[in-house]
Amino acid sequence: MIKYYNRKTNDYDIEKVAGEKYLNWTYSSPMGMNLLEIFIKKKFFSKIYGFYCDRRLSHNKIDKFINDFQIDMSLCENQTSDFKCFNDFFTRKLKKEARPIKADKNILISPGDGKILAYKNLNLNSVTEVKGINYSFYELINNDSLAKEYDNGTCLILRLCPTDYHRFHFIDNGTCENTIKLDGFYYSVNPIALSKIPSLFCKNKREYAIFHSENFGDVIFMEVGATCVGSIIQTYKPNTKIFKGDEKGYFKFGGSTVILFFKENTIKVDNDILNQSKLGYETSVIMGEPIGSKK
């Protein structure tokens, strides 16, 4: 059971997890863990499932998925009949009015839909992942000199579950450098998996780029792959002018994570998100929603 904080109701909700029985069996049973290490965490498994989700045969999964997880299709640019395969649906675009962007340059917005954790006063040797599990920031980005620039800074971890809108966006005007890709495995990023696999983010496939934002300094913008995420697709053009809310990219099928790192004294995260993170709870947010401000 995954409990998270709902800002609208000021109360806790229970997340409806896609494939929850499978996740619990895989990460909690000896047989499941053996299968995970031998096959499921490997690129080959995710490529096979990604191949299926790219084929017309997978179209029959769409209606059931929409009904099971009560996805509001009125927010989407396309109707169900427009999608050629499940990945077309999974990477669906939303109408512009579905995710309004705060124009105020001092307002920090969420880069995507999902559940967010926030940690300030970053310790580079011990970044909290979830459920008290820690990892090294040095190991995560594999660049010691760059990592040192973010000592005592702020980290935001946005977890996208399979039922979420899976495109991620820029949080400010600016320019973004080329993407750096780090190979790894394809563990699930669900809290069930995070509690079982130490330093999971450092073991999974991930990509990052330096985003030179106009109002929040140089931000490390990272995407972490997960089980069945066949691809992390970057749609932005490096080193060109970017505007707040512009699309950066999207994930194909699977749960995924976006991580942002800010330098010291650049942002102030909203108190409710910080307080819930201290208690060990994620907060539900949508793309474009204010989550903090310029310091």
From Swiss-Prot:
Cellular compartments annotated: Cell membrane
GO CC annotations, alphabetized: plasma membrane
Membrane topology label: Peripheral membrane protein
Post-translational events: Is synthesized initially as an inactive proenzyme. Formation of the active enzyme involves a self-maturation process in which the active site pyruvoyl group is generated from an internal serine residue via an autocatalytic post-translational modification. Two non-identical subunits are generated from the proenzyme in this reaction, and the pyruvate is formed at the N-terminus of the alpha chain, which is derived from the carboxyl end of the proenzyme.
Pathway linked to the protein: Phospholipid metabolism; phosphatidylethanolamine biosynthesis; phosphatidylethanolamine from CDP-diacylglycerol: step 2/2
InterPro entries linked to this entry: PS_Dcarbxylase, PSD-B, PSD_type2_pro
UniProt GO molecular function: phosphatidylserine decarboxylase activity
E.C. designation(s): 4.1.1.65
Pfam family, one: PS_Dcarbxylase
Cofactor(s) it depends on: pyruvate
Keyword Protease: no
Enzyme class: lyase
Job of this protein: Catalyzes the formation of phosphatidylethanolamine (PtdEtn) from phosphatidylserine (PtdSer).
Protein name listed in UniProt: Phosphatidylserine decarboxylase proenzyme
Species: Clostridium botulinum (strain Kyoto / Type A2)
Lineage, opening ranks: Bacteria, Bacillati, Bacillota, Clostridia, Eubacteriales
